[in-house]
Swiss-Prot record:
It comes from Bos taurus (Bovine). SMART domains: EFh (SM00054). A lipid is attached at G2 (N-myristoyl glycine). Ca(2+) 3 binds at D208, N210, D212, R214, E219. This is Calcium-binding protein 1. The gene is CABP1. Phosphorylated. The phosphorylation regulates the activity. Signal peptide: none annotated. It is a lipid-anchor.
Amino acid sequence: MGNCVKSPLRNLSRKMRQEETSYTVVQTSEEGLAASGELPGPLLMLAQNCAVMHNLLGPACIFLRKGFAENRQPDRSLRPEEIEELREAFREFDKDKDGYINCRDLGNCMRTMGYMPTEMELIELSQQINMNLGGHVDFDDFVELMGPKLLAETADMIGVKELRDAFREFDTNGDGEISTSELREAMRKLLGHQVGHRDIEEIIRDVDLNGDGRVDFEEFVRMMSR
C-alpha cells in the first residue's frame, strides 16, 4: 500500500505542537476566523483543517490546522459525495474525454486524491491494468480500484475538492496557475505578514516541476502532499 497523505500530516502535526513556541501559528476563533484576519472560505477551511502546508524555509512555513476529521469505516458502501469525489478526480485525468484514464496517468490521479503510491505499487497497478484492462481504466474500474482505498484511508486526508477549492483561492486570476505574486499574497493572508520575494521564488523553484516559474494544479497537489 502506498504512503498516504495522512501519515506526513500527522508527523507534521506533532512537530507543530513541539515547535509552536518558536513559530507563529494561524489561530482560529470559535467563529472560525483567523486571528490574523478573516480569510476567504476555502483558505480558511484549509487553515482550520490542515496540519502544515509546507516546511521549506523556516520563516516562510505556513502552519495550518489539522482536521478533515470525519472517521470513515471500511465496512460500508461509498457515500454519494465520495463517488462524486472519485468522479471529479477521474474527469480531471480523462484528458481526451473518452471515458478512460491511461494507466500512465493513474499515479498523478491518485496523488490528486491524496494518495502517495510507491513506485512498486504503481508498477503492480500498471501490470494489472495492462494485462486485464487493455492499458486503460474506465470509471467503473476506477471506482473498483480506488473505492477500497477511499474507504480504508481517507480519515484526515485532503480530498480533491478541498485541494481544488484551495487552489482556486491561490489562483486569484483564474488562469489555472499560481504565480509568484499570488503565492506571496496567499502566504501573507495565512501568516499575517509579508514573505520575501526571494523566499517565495525558492518555494516555487522547489515545487515547479516543469520549470515555467509557476505552480499548476498537479504541482500544487505535490506541494500540499509533502
